[in-house]
UniProtKB/Swiss-Prot annotation:
The keyword Transmembrane does not apply. ATP binds at residue 254. GO terms for biological process: tyrosyl-tRNA aminoacylation. It comes from Thermococcus kodakarensis (strain ATCC BAA-918 / JCM 12380 / KOD1). A motif ('KMSKS' region) lies at residues 251-255. Coiled coil: none annotated. It catalyses: tRNA(Tyr) + L-tyrosine + ATP = L-tyrosyl-tRNA(Tyr) + AMP + diphosphate + H(+). It comes from the Archaea. L-tyrosine binds at residues 37, 168, 172, 175, 190. This is Tyrosine--tRNA ligase. SUPFAM superfamilies: Nucleotidylyl transferase. NCBIfam families: PRK08560.1, tyrS.
Amino acid sequence: MDIERKIELIKKKPTEELLTEENLRHLLEVGAPLQHYIGFEISGYIHLGTGLMAGAKIADLQKAGVKTRIFLADWHSWINDKLGGDLEVIQKVALTYFKEGMKQSIKVMGGDPDKVEFVLASEILDKGDYWQTVIDISKNVTLARMLRSITIMGRQMGEAIDFAKLIYPAMQVADIFYQGVTIAHAGMDQRKAHVIAIEVAQKLKYHPLEWKGEKLKPVALHHHLLLGLQEPPVWPIESEEQFKELKTQMKMSKSKPYSAVFIHDSPEEIKQKLRKAFCPAREVKYNPVLDWAEYIIFREEPTEFTIHRPAKFGGDVTYTTFEELKKDFAEGKLHPLDLKNAVAEYLIELLKPVREYFEKHPEPLELMREIKITR
């Protein structure tokens, strides 16, 4: 596969940002090993924004010949008070429910879960030289910068935090260099940590990325954050700037069950959540149902997406591109309820293998149901 095709696959939806394409091209041209990683806190049920968005991108990366890795961030989850801040529980969930859920998500999005390496953070944090890397990074970043970066944890700037949380951004950056990662992957909400990684890359003494005597910068790949199904905290949204400010609050959240569809939700739960979804008629800019259609259903174009309607409401209609769907919705030719029902049916069918897996292997899900889910 040539370099242009590899770049095309890596940039494909749901990629929203690549820092930078020039650096990626350089890594490909010099023949540097392409090692991907995406790190996850272990914090509750896997929703589509985690499972399907990451799974889709992992599938693309595999097709481009990249080695893929999922980093199960148990210590980071402990620092961020996930699952009651119980490290033992976090580790148990990471190696059962979360690992299996991500494998099934990757599979339904066209990837090969057997080609994904799963690494528990404890496996590398127990090594003494990991902490040398954390200190090395910390010496190259100001305290003010670290404080601004705590938003990667879902925390607000200015929020009262314990000191452990200040170590978190440096640990996340260290994870990249210590594992020899050349493609650091996450949702757009993790951007601040990745920018630090790029900026300190050529200053590090411990575990820098090196290839044939050259210190390399990692590529940061950020995928789209699916909008939550709930109404935005402010409506109407007056400007693109206001939308950017609200976007993190509008993303799917496992602590707000009706904002998210989980990978193992029943058909009835999926229908119910989509029925309640915020989907104003003719609204195409800030519409979570259209957002899901664009990034899940129309990730590959052309495709065939059929909306079934009674003849008196126009009968069945099939769309092959997202722009066709968006245009009809904007012009009022497609009713919100018809769109919601069709998206629900698509998701029910897409997630069927995941449901079947957890029906045959119920123990991981039963474990999750017994555990208090924290934000």
